[in-house]
């Protein structure tokens, strides 16, 4: 299915399974966004976490899927959130994967729209009511390490 470009990861496979089994599910009208780093010098964005939305289009969940927390690797990655603009035709929505270098040499892949923000809003994380969420996530992760 990946070779045929029919799905974009496990989320689409879940959706196909729900459709096949006639299961009830909800699909948010606002497409997924991306949380990651913004480099003001190059103007590039490098997303590494999926941003999912509630029925009203507000941020509901951040899934740190490409930048896992591991012992010795607990860097902050969320400086900005990129979201598809409300009111723009969905045919303009794309989700791409690009190489992080040279602007993000420590990050192999970047997800989201990395430079052309015509159809996307790029908002600093501090503008959201959950601005400290990554700090808390790292705090809880580090606390969990003490339970070895």
Residue spans of the language-model regions?
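Glycosyltransferase catalytic domains, chiefly GT-A lineage
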Residues: 1-148
């Amino acid at each position: 299915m990946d070779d045929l470009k029919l799905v974009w990861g496990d989320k689409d496979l879940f959706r196909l399974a729900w459709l096949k089994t006639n299961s009830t599910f909800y699909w948010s009208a606002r497409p997924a966004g991306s949380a990651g780093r913004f480099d003001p010098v190059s103007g590039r964005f490098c997303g590494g976490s999926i941003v999912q939305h509630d029925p009203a289009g507000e941020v509901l969940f951040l899934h740190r899927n490409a930048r896992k927390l591991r012992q010795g690797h607990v860097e902050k990655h969320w400086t900005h959130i990129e979201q598809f603009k409300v009111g723009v035709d969905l045919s303009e929505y794309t989700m791409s994967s690009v190489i992080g270098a040279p602007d993000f040499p420590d990050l192999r892949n970047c997800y989201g729209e990395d430079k052309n923000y015509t159809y996307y809003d790029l908002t600093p994380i501090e503008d959201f009511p959950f601005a400290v969420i990554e700090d808390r996530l790292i705090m809880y992760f580090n606390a969990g390490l003490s339970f070895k």
